[in-house]
């Protein structure tokens, strides 16, 4: 089980990313616009720097919903590999069966 602080920190980052997503996209559009003047692009860069660092989606970590484990997490289920195996063995995930060939 991951520390509660790490799980909460990740949730906070997700909330910040959602809150600032539109603002980040608008500012990045100005920064990447080749038709904008250098002054406009510079001002946009300054505004971009004022956005919190944790608002960047890159800083989020995909974690297991049950344990908070940061590695070995399947996107399809949102669970870590260990929990997927435990739940699948109990037959609680529809359509998932143990492989045999």
From Swiss-Prot:
GO terms for cellular component: cytoplasm; small ribosomal subunit. The keyword Disulfide bond does not apply. The keyword Metal-binding does not apply. Keywords: Ribonucleoprotein, Ribosomal protein, RNA-binding, rRNA-binding. One of its GO terms (molecular function) is rRNA binding. Part of the 30S ribosomal subunit. Contacts proteins S3 and S10. PANTHER family: 30S RIBOSOMAL PROTEIN S14 (PTHR19836), SMALL RIBOSOMAL SUBUNIT PROTEIN US14M (PTHR19836:SF19). Belongs to the universal ribosomal protein uS14 family. Binds 16S rRNA, required for the assembly of 30S particles and may also be responsible for determining the conformation of the 16S rRNA at the A site. This is Small ribosomal subunit protein uS14. The lineage of its organism: Bacteria, Pseudomonadati, Pseudomonadota, Betaproteobacteria, Neisseriales.
